[in-house]
Amino acid sequence: MAGPHPVGDPAPDDGLLPASAAVDAFVRDFGVYLHVPFCRVRCGYCDFNTYTATELRGVKQSDYASQAVLEVEAAGRILTASGVPKRSVATVFFGGGTPTLLPVTDLAKMLSAVRDLWGLAAGAEVTTEANPDSVDAAYLGALADAGFTRVSFGMQSAVPHVLATLERTHDPERVPLVVEWARAAGLDVSLDLIYGTPGESLADWRASLEQALSLHPDHLSAYSLIVEDGTKLARQIRSGEIAPTDDDQQADFYELADELLAAAGYDWYEVSNWATSDAHRSRHNLAYWTGQDWWGVGPGAHSHVGGVRWWNVKHPAAYSERMLGGLSPAAGRETLDAPTRELERILLQSRIRTGIPVASLSAAGRIEVASLIADELINAKAALAGTIELTLRGRLLADAVVRRLSD
């Protein structure tokens, strides 16, 4: 289970948003995230808001889709009553947890509720996450028939001892099969990898990258393992049972990923994400990084509309109680002030290749550009043309770049 909620104000039971949420809504895209908070087992490194069967306090997975639909319907009423104009949905993303633990009919039911309420924009991106051992060819075909366009498989590694440390439940041999089945169903394919697992060597990481690239995914994400407080992995490291990966090793892993992916024709478009073309970038995640609007459905889901951010109660039992009681599931919220929105803009947009317009920075930030070029943290040619774009070194030190641009 995830950590504590963010610090914010209590959310009203009716969920109504302040008038500021409606300002300039039509200049922002609108997406929907649907959180499915169920997993067969809890991986030792995972800090996401997920629950195994023994942690559900009597809540039934089979009831979840209907309750999520209740929130979708409530979202329509809340946005309308708050004066936020109705917009078609540009992206839909099912995350978790393991969304594909639910029957396809349940995912289709939730997607239909989104489509019926708001409509899907032309060419809308509809993604679900999946574990390689949670789907088969028939399931993936049914996803495509229901309107899904993309599947993101949690491959994580191709090396058995790394998967064992992460406590992943699939065999490496399963990944090529599910990719083949997804392709046959007409779905775009993304693979998620994790690097820096304790005990993982650079040769192990190379093997995982080469295996992933041999499958020719449209998109690949490579995330550094972050050891979160409260997880089993954190306890193992604290007790000395497992040795953590140091920062220099993490940098070596990242540099190898960028080298192999670039050689295979993948372009980085966000610090941890690469795609074969602009068309295969994750548009849903780009919406997060560029400050668009989205409604997050489900326990622990976060939403953002016009500078107003809120988050739902975490446990499925609490979520079920509020949905069946006709109350908003929001536990808290905050309205971002101008300085906070500006800091978040720099924090998020500096990570993407399209970058930040130099002219949009503060005077102090613009002055800092020259020293960032000198330190080889940003691309000199791009900066002189008016855009902040991180170099490879800058991607490794992205947090430092943000501090210097925003101080």
Question: In which residue ranges do the predicted regions lie?
Answer:
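Minor-groove-contacting beta-hairpin "wing" of winged helix-turn-helix DNA-binding domains
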Residues: 385-391
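A short, conserved structural fragment
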Residues: 373-385
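C-terminal scaffold of the Radical SAM
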Residues: 15-29, 49-363
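Short, amphipathic alpha-helical interaction segments positioned at domain boundaries
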Residues: 392-407
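Flexible, acidic/Gly-rich N-terminal and inter-domain linker regions that tether
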Residues: 1-33, 40, 86, 380
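Local cysteine-cluster metal-coordination motifs and their immediate loop/turn environment
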Residues: 35-50
